[in-house]
A protein has these predicted regions:
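Short, structured motif recognition centered on aromatic/hydrophobic residues
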Residues: 26-36, 45, 62-69
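Short, glycine/charged-rich beta-strand-loop motifs at protein surfaces that mediate ligand recognition
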Residues: 20, 33-39, 52
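Acidic, glycine/proline-rich low-complexity segments that act as flexible tails and inter-domain linkers
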Residues: 1-24, 54, 76-93
Length: 93
C-alpha cells in the first residue's frame, strides 16, 4: 500500500501539479471537478475542497464550478459533491 501511495503522490503532486501553464487555483478546481465526476470518492473530494481553500478558491467559486458540472456529471454526483462542500465549508451563522 505504501508503494502505491508514494507513486500516487509523486505522479499527481510532482509531475502533474508542477506543470507551469495553469495556476494552482485553476489546477485545484479542475481536480475537484474531475473527482466529483467520478462519484464514490468523497474522502478525496473533501480533501480537494480543503485544498482549493488553501490555494485561495472561495466556497462561492467552488459552488459555481460544481454547478457548471451539473449537465455533464448529473444530479446525483453534483449533489454528493455539494454535500461534501457543505460538510467541509458549512454556512456561517
Amino acid at each position: 500500500l505504501q508503494q502505491i501511495q508514494d507513486y500516487l503522490s509523486s505522479f499527481c503532486f510532482g509531475d502533474t501539479y508542477t506543470r507551469k501553464t495553469l495556476n494552482l487555483q485553476d489546477r485545484e478546481m479542475l481536480t475537484l471537478c474531475a473527482i466529483a465526476s467520478l462519484g464514490g470518492c468523497e474522502p478525496q473530494l473533501k480533501a480537494h475542497i480543503q485544498g482549493n481553500v488553501n490555494v485561495g478558491n472561495t466556497k462561492g467559486i467552488l459552488l459555481e464550478a460544481l454547478t457548471q458540472c451539473l449537465p455533464y456529471i448529473g444530479f446525483p454526483r453534483t449533489l454528493n459533491a455539494l454535500g461534501c462542500l457543505s460538510q467541509v465549508l458549512p454556512d456561517k451563522k
